[in-house]
Amino acid sequence: MVIKRQDDATSAEPLEGGLRDGLFVEQRRRVDDFDFGKNTAVVFDDMLDRSVPFYSEIQRMVAELAVDFAADGTTIYDLGCSTATTIAQIDRGLPAGMDVRYVGIDSSPEMLALAAKKLAESGVTRPCELRHGDLNSNLEISNASVVLLVLTLQFVRPLHRERIIREIYEGLEPNGCLILVEKVLGENSAFNRLFINHYYEMKRRNGYSDLEIAQKREALENVLVPYRFEENKELLRGQGFRHVDTFFKWYNFCAMVAMKG
């Protein structure tokens, strides 16, 4: 059963997701800041598949770890849940009868509308609440065994990141985990240039043109603010996480798991 808050603003017009990403195919006279509205939402799944290296494998790994840490009577939070791909994947891996509920939070009503549709089509029967919310504001996290930040924290203004991690830590039950997947900077400028070049080569292999790559890069310039790997690790440790490890790394992408001791 999918449960929605009355104020979650998911009453947008019906949307069909799964379209091919062509947001930046045409030359634009002016490239506006990237956003997660309707035009992005309907192509978002394809965008991730073609823009994030080994995306399906990352999703599988995130789901496996979430299942490892999920506990009866607790809540699994997905912060920046977008179209709920991760929640659906986790639900398939949980043992039958495990009593957990999901909370998905996203700032885009259109993403939440597609999330509700995907969860219904995936046959998710555990309780799931989809909330319209901005991570730049205060979070409400409690009784959590798992909290996910999958390619989300990089879009949060840096001045709010410590607070978010602290609120996650405080809302986790003992032995609960935070799973963090981020685009990251190289530890020095030479490595960073190499990693970015190879990333763009990957996008070309996946069908993006140089124009699309350039225009999306410009759109993201003031929106996506990545940290270095060590900065993210220090951020987690600084807010209380003592056990932090890396489970995926590809050039300028990294995935980490942190456990509350």
Predicted features and spans:
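Class I SAM-dependent methyltransferase Rossmann-like catalytic core
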Residues: 29-33, 38-58
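Conserved alpha-helix/loop element of class I SAM-dependent methyltransferases that forms part
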Residues: 54-72
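Class I SAM-dependent methyltransferase SAM/SAH-binding core
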Residues: 77-78, 84-137
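A short acidic, Gly/Pro-enriched loop at the edge of an enzyme's catalytic core
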Residues: 139-147
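A short glycine-rich, Lys/Arg-flanked "PGG" loop and its adjoining helix->strand segment in the class I
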Residues: 162-174
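Conserved class I S-adenosyl-L-methionine
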Residues: 177-205
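Short alpha-helix
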Residues: 222-239
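Core SAM-dependent methyltransferase catalytic element
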Residues: 242-261
